[in-house]
Amino acid sequence: SQLGVVQPGDRLVAFADDFADAFARGFDAFDVVLVGEPSVAAFASASEGFDASFEVEGPHLWWFVNSIGGFGLRVPDLRTLGRAAREAHALLVVDNTVASVFGCDSLRLGAVLSLEALDRVCAGRAPRKLVAASVARSQLKRHRVDAAAEFAHALLAGCGAPVLDLSADEADVLERGLETLDARMQAHFDRARALAEYLAANEMVRNVRYPGLTSHPDHAVATGILEHGFGPAVEFDLMDCIAGEFFSILPDEFRTSPAGGSTTRLSAPRGKPGERHPPLRRHRRPSAGGCHSR
């Protein structure tokens, strides 16, 4: 919402059931429709009757998903969503924070705008919140032009979004983080998979949700959308303990450590107080460390 690209008169269709409250606050008084599935059918249905335009004066239709996100760590088929969005004159926006650019090339798959918080890129050392906004190439092969991408670029350039002015320290943190990003992300992905497989075999845990498990509803889709593995996040339900009780027996660092750093971070799903499944959104330590804490 802080980018300012969504304007009054536009419609925003989003799959973000774990952040419904944030959408309500950030887009108050806007035409926002939250869908229950990250599917083409759900987005198309929520867009019916809206006369979208790629003209500057609008109105504009926005489709929003996470490359990995929502309750259950869903993975939408960005290829089919991207094609359907263009047919509907919609602009597909993907929050790529969880998977990161290492784990998902959302712009190549069909997004016109990709957003990514840079906590992980900076290894948790950034002094403030940094978010990268990237627009897809508008010039395609054989001199074809992607009208949606070209229009998204024009909107972003004309909305008055703040230009990033990095201090020398911030630029240094970002540069050093980029040098080690691939190795760190591969370790996160590998350890998340090991943790998911361990939890799936643990009798004290149920409903392990991780795109790399064949039991995940989007496993087949994820194999063609995600790269280098299936992301750094695992979500699960505890059998006889609510999230608050579970957190109380763990060291504070599992809740308070900087996002993107080397320590595992645990959180309970937003909007579901008392639920028995605190999802492990960011796995940072070797799998044994996470497993012993349970």
Question: Can you name each region flagged by the protein language model?
Answer:
Residues 1-204:
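Conserved PLP-enzyme active-site core in the AAT-like
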Residues 204-291:
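Conserved C-terminal alpha-helix-loop-beta "cap" of PLP-dependent enzymes
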